[in-house]
Amino acid sequence: VSIGIQDDVASTLAIIEKRLQQGYQRIKLKIKPGWDIELAQGVRAAFPEVMLMLDANSAYTLHDSEYLRQLDDYDLLMIEQPLPYNDIYQHSKLQPQIETAICLDESITTVDDAMLAIELGACRIINLKPARVGGFTESIKIYRFCVENGVALWIGGMLETGIGRSANLAFASLPGVTLPCDLSATDRYYDPDVTEPPFVIRPDSTIATPTENGIGVMVQMDRVQQAVQYCREHLPYSLPIANV
């Protein structure tokens, strides 16, 4: 589960405790310069065994390499997208300077990006978000490349409703997706969702993959209509929304 930047470390620790009680076992924390070392130190002191990763969202530059190296002390699963998303080359310069595995997210939009990143040694892990790369055609290409070349891979989401979430879950269940994925329970973002049944976190920190026909969930058209009506009434711009 992902946790954004909070007011202080104590607030972050409280949220982590809540998420762990809800069943999540892998914690991702957003970081930025000045909100990183102290945060990692505090989390490790409070939760020494938790599976922990940090997501920088391109907040650093290569000049911060010595600073980022300090994060090696906190047994991180990975650091995600530390440098600008459009600079795979700079990531290839950073990865040899730190022990923590770099994971590329926004940098990977095509299989060619993935191939270049691995060839240059810019990362050891790829976060594959089907919506980010244009859908499942390109996702499958990236997935196959990672599996064939032994690249660690996990599946992320982009605030999908149950329609997209069910497809992402099916994709995340493929062999070769080797790391915990960033797919949360339905009520983390939508309550209610436009589909039934909802996705829930099980005691072992997993979500059941849909097994019903089609995408595995049923679209609730009354909720879709409510969402469309809300958008028409409240968004400050008009959307080309078809009648449903």
Predicted feature locations:
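Metal-dependent enolase-superfamily TIM-barrel catalytic cores that perform enediolate-based chemistry
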Residues: 1-98
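Short glycine/serine/threonine-biased micro-segments
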Residues: 2, 154-155, 162, 212-214
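Short loop or secondary-structure boundary microenvironments that flank
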Residues: 5, 33, 58, 129-132, ...
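Electropositive phosphate-/nucleotide-binding environments in soluble metabolic enzymes
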Residues: 9, 13, 37, 85-88, ...
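Structural signal for hydrophobic packing residues in well-ordered secondary-structure cores
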Residues: 47, 172-176, 211
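Shared catalytic-loop signature of beta/alpha-barrel
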Residues: 75, 86-103, 108-206
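Active-site donor-binding loop signature of nucleotide-sugar glycosyltransferases
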Residues: 81, 183, 212
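C-terminal extensions of enzymes
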Residues: 188, 194-244
